[in-house]
């Protein structure tokens, strides 16, 4: 039996520049950190029969991998040429549709478990790259590369994506004092809406390819602010994060319909009136979590 634990991620800067439509022209930059919230996968080879069993929010029992409804599990098993006698069960601290990288956590965790089951060692970089191949190339999801790399590497991670899609991974040097301040001052709030990012990311990618000025300018700003946020965190002067998040949110809303709505705007305005210095929505937007930076009045903001 193999058990894997893969972390969810929160993006601090550069979100959206990891999409092929952008980085293939301008290069991408991401600064994210892994949370202490996880996706757990349990993989086992039963000896009693040859069935393929899958447990997630649903349960599946099939004779052929091709009959699986869960597309990520199906693609992973096919890629590793595992065709029978396998049990896969998953549990997570955070539900799907959170904007925190849940699908990639599942992909990375499952690939890690399956390779381990086959006694195959993969570097973290190759594991992330293989997960990208599954989600982006095979399943044709309109998504970027950060979720897979953050799930594989964890920590405070910087991704620099070249125009040819190669990813340079470095770990940001964050002091213990700054880490404690971030833990204290960054607050996540669930919007109550599970998002489906395909439509939003698809629109963003099309607008980038069509060279729509508003979207390109927003992504350029978001990438530049990512570098500045990295410098802020490394310097320890994290009060500036609130202002940076607030500016980021203004640009983010311009990139696609559905990123925000009147209810989300009310949530954001209420947070700003009750102690938050700035905030941003997780992932592509349209649901999931808001991340707010707040130094004082946290109890008031939570209420």
Segments the model singles out, each with a brief description of its role:
Residues 31, 94, 100, 159:
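Short clusters of hydrophobic/aromatic residues that line enzyme substrate/ligand-binding pockets
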Residues 100-124, 152:
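DPxDG-like acidic metal-binding loop motif
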Residues 287:
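Glycine-rich active-site/cofactor-binding loop and its immediate structural neighborhood
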């Amino acid at each position: 039996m193999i058990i894997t634990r893969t972390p969810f991620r929160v993006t601090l800067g550069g979100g959206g520049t990891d999409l092929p439509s952008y980085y293939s022209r301008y290069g991408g930059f991401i600064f994210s950190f892994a949370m202490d919230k996880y996706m757990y996968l349990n993989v086992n080879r039963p000896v009693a029969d040859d069935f393929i069993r899958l447990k997630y929010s649903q349960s599946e029992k099939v004779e052929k991998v091709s009959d699986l409804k869960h597309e990520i599990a199906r693609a992973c098993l096919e890629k590793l040429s595992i065709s029978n006698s396998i049990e896969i069960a998953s549990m997570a601290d955070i539900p799907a549709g959170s904007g925190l990288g849940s699908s990639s956590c599942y992909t990375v965790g499952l690939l890690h478990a399956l390779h381990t089951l086959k006694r195959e060692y993969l570097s973290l970089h190759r594991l992330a790259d293989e997960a990208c191949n599954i989600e982006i190339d095979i399943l044709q999801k309109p998504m970027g590369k950060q979720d897979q790399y953050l799930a594989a590497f964890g920590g405070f991670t910087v991704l620099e994506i070249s125009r040819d899609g190669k990813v340079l991974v470095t770990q940001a040097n964050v002091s213990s004092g700054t880490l404690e301040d971030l833990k204290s001052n960054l607050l996540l709030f669930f919007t109550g809406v599970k998002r489906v990012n395909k439509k939003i990311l698809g629109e963003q990618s099309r607008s980038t390819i069509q060279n729509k000025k508003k979207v390109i300018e927003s992504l350029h700003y978001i990438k530049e602010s990512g570098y500045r946020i990295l410098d802020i965190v490394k310097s320890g002067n994290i009060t500036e994060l609130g202002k940076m998040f607030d500016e980021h949110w203004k640009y983010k809303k311009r990139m696609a319909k559905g990123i925000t709505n009147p209810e989300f705007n009310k949530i954001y305005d209420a947070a700003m009136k009750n102690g938050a210095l700035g905030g941003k929505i997780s992932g592509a937007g349209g649901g999931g979590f808001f991340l707010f930076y707040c130094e004082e009045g946290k109890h008031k903001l939570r209420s």
